[in-house]
Amino acid sequence: MKTALSFLLTAPLWAEVQLDPTLHINGVIGATSASSFEEVGGHAHDPNDNFALQGIDLGLSLRVDDWLAGFINANVFTDSDHELDVELEEAFLRFQELPGGFDLRVGRFMNRLGSQNNKHLHSWDYVNSDLFTSQFLGEEGLTSEGLELTWLAEFDQTFFAISSSYGQAVTHEDHDEGPTDTHDHGSESAYFSDDLTTARAIFGYNHTDFHRHRLGLNGAWGDNRYDRETNLYSLDYTYTWSENGLESGGRELSLGMELASRDVAWQHPDNAANIGNVSQSTFAAFASYRFAEKWTTAIRYEHLQGREAGAELHMGDIEYAFDSEERDRVSLALTRSFDLGDHDSFLRLQYSHDELPGESADSIFLQFGLNFGPGEVR
């Protein structure tokens, strides 16, 4: 113990320590024909008013030689009540280049699960979150406190990486509304809430430097807010063509899809004997094309299967233990990047069409993003 403490205290005297602060500011103005922005939203950082502060993200990356890295960040944003909220998103250490090709993350981190969950708001390709993240993983995605082990094997034209984590799913305060929720049973109770295990495997194949393929297989198993279990599986695939190969710049085309399914064990809160399981799936197809320097257009189609389970009669009305409505959404985005000093910032114009139960909704958004600082430790 004494030796380890001495090592940590003296390491800065000879190690190369680098601290890199980052700042990301995202805001959006928009309008929707839906009855409210909540009808077409779902994620805590989705537009929720005619003007919304999606996030002021303050971060700090730590790098110590090649063996240790870390990251901490907090996000300030306007919530669904149009009040400022603060969220500690991540705070972890990453031990790199361990024997056998392993890396270890310890602390609070966004889980590597699917194509978006591990990305911060400023890295999104669209104004709003995808339905898989917001409807299956939570209003702020899936974050856990624990440890994650990653193994990477690289070959000539291919690589394989697998990450597996175990910990406690972070339950955000917004999800615990209190007594008024007693008879408002959406799909939120299916979110992970306690012990959680996740795994993500990525297969990469570079046919050439100009044509690249990525296939991801994902799984998550853990306790849910019904005090039962949710099991989730997903697959994502992306093909990328780059005019300049591995060099920056030039035209670039990306095509992809994501398919996810979950099995939710539910229990009606008013009748402990009313229990069961329900399965639900979601699908997305997306494409983006950088057709000129600083200009990118993107399109995304999403479908969420609607499911109901656990019917109970309450004061003359039928209520369900699990109730998730069917949704279809098409989003078109046009992004213009700008150089502000050494940093990339952007303006994004997006149109979305949502097919909701009983109504269709059209929404238009203009988003701005200001980014300062180098790449963050992931």
List the predicted regions and their residue ranges:
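Outer membrane beta-barrel
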Residues: E16-A34, H45-H172, D195, I202-D209, ...
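Sequence/structural signature of outer-membrane beta-barrel proteins
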Residues: V28-F37, N75-D81, L113, L131-F132, ...
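Outer-membrane beta-barrel "beta-signal"
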Residues: L149, L332-F338, S360-R378
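Detector for outer-membrane/organellar transmembrane beta-barrel domains
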Residues: Q18-D20, G30, F203-F322, D328
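Outer-membrane beta-barrel biogenesis signature
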Residues: L5-N48, S115, G245-L253, D339-D344, ...
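Repeated loop/turn-to-beta-strand initiation elements of outer-membrane beta-barrel proteins
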Residues: D66-G70, G100-L104, D156-F160, T208-H213, ...
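Residues that define the transmembrane beta-barrel architecture of outer-membrane proteins
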Residues: D49-Q54, D85-E89, G141-E145, S193-T197, ...
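Outer-membrane beta-barrel translocator domains and adjoining extracellular loop/strand segments
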Residues: S33-G42, D81-L88, N118-H122, E173-G186, ...
